[in-house]
């Protein structure tokens, strides 16, 4: 299993550290050649408008959409914004991998960053207490079927899954708790097994 981490901008190295601690091989993705080797992709936090502009100028945007048809993608914070179907109050045209509408920086600016324990339900009836770090985090304003809500904060979704894609408005890579990354790895394994059949 080889997990790609989009490395155009943002905190991609923290995802690498988390996956390496779990014994998972990773590759920084900046070109099509690197993407072609990957079984899945993580889109990290960072500056969503800068990341989208770089995706467009490197011709990676359409390649990512095609990649995501058959392979899992996990986006955190800015990565969630890029994976959404609509960004409120923005001209950005996101990837459309998750049937959600988001609002950038809606949890506050950099000075308003905070950490809070949230209940995460990665399996039915199995509650995990997870330390969620919100840094200029987006809010998920609307979600549509078949989006599954795996965690909420103050009544709003903050961790969602749609098919073989996962998105978080917070930063699980900044904790020492690997639960959400392990969940994504299980999604990747399941996807690999399904494509062997």
Swiss-Prot record:
GO terms for biological process: glutamine catabolic process; pyridoxal phosphate biosynthetic process; pyridoxine metabolic process. Pfam families: SNO. One of its GO terms (molecular function) is glutaminase activity. Coiled coil: none annotated. The active site is at 77 (nucleophile), 171 (charge relay system), 173 (charge relay system). Catalyzes the hydrolysis of glutamine to glutamate and ammonia as part of the biosynthesis of pyridoxal 5'-phosphate. The resulting ammonia molecule is channeled to the active site of PdxS. In the presence of PdxS, forms a dodecamer of heterodimers. Only shows activity in the heterodimer. Belongs to the glutaminase PdxT/SNO family. This is Pyridoxal 5'-phosphate synthase subunit PdxT.
